[in-house]
């Protein structure tokens, strides 16, 4: 049987909030089976917990943000959630003393390192997967995203940026997900932005924590970061990273194929909501025998299982 997983012990880190520019402290704690991922704002009195569910995503401008019915928000969850999804962590309590998750280096790599450093604990209950039974698709103009039946988890993703540096890179990628492939090929891809947009955002008191330390920055013609790119196709890989995090608010790892063109946080969330609303399009499954498990969901790379 494949079991649910949590972190083996508590781990804490600090970083900078992308929009506020302020120091943020974040703590990840083990959680019991069937808890899911729960975020807690510890800077409020009393503290406020928000379950990571698709219907709690109420802001998708430049990031994915959870917002409860009282308007309490936790922004920029997607890179941390990509790491949780990539390492197969089902249950965790995440405490944060600010309205946003720290941006770290703009990728999921610091979160992967943090989670692997404390290890992953197998738990006593069967892991549940969300298996796609029939296609579900959402569209917005020429942008679209869909989930289709597939034995495993495959991503077929394309972007289309009219920028000379991005146009020179590969803007389409197909990958069969595995934890090791995520860590090696996707997790280090950083968020990217254009200098003209950053200047506008800062003028409006946004992106105050953004810098070349946590993003790939481009002008009209080239990448401005002195060290260049981490992957030749870092742009499309980061969009895939974002999608991994955005899809994880479905509450379970997905068994299916995710196909998308020019999608972002908003359309990713619309897809998850559309899927969950069409209950005949999916089912929750567990795998009793090791040989039944799609190769995508083997034990995570670097996991310390007890």
UniProtKB/Swiss-Prot annotation:
Active site: 265 (proton donor)
GO (cellular component) term, any one: membrane
Pathway recorded for this protein: Glycolipid biosynthesis; lipid IV(A) biosynthesis; lipid IV(A) from (3R)-3-hydroxytetradecanoyl-[acyl-carrier-protein] and UDP-N-acetyl-alpha-D-glucosamine: step 2/6
Keywords: Hydrolase, Lipid A biosynthesis, Lipid biosynthesis, Lipid metabolism, Metal-binding, Zinc
A Gene Ontology biological process term: lipid A biosynthetic process
Record-linked Gene3D superfamilies: lpxc deacetylase, domain 1, lpxc deacetylase, domain 2
Reactions mediated catalytically: a UDP-3-O-[(3R)-3-hydroxyacyl]-N-acetyl-alpha-D-glucosamine + H2O = a UDP-3-O-[(3R)-3-hydroxyacyl]-alpha-D-glucosamine + acetate
Name this protein carries in UniProt: UDP-3-O-acyl-N-acetylglucosamine deacetylase
Keyword Iron: no
UniProt: Zn(2+) binding residues: 79, 238, 242
PANTHER family the UniProt entry points to: UDP-3-O-ACYL-N-ACETYLGLUCOSAMINE DEACETYLASE 1, MITOCHONDRIAL-RELATED
Family per similarity comment: Belongs to the LpxC family.
The protein's enzyme class: hydrolase
Role played: Catalyzes the hydrolysis of UDP-3-O-myristoyl-N-acetylglucosamine to form UDP-3-O-myristoylglucosamine and acetate, the committed step in lipid A biosynthesis.
Pfam family, one: LpxC
Requisite cofactors: Zn(2+)
Gene: lpxC
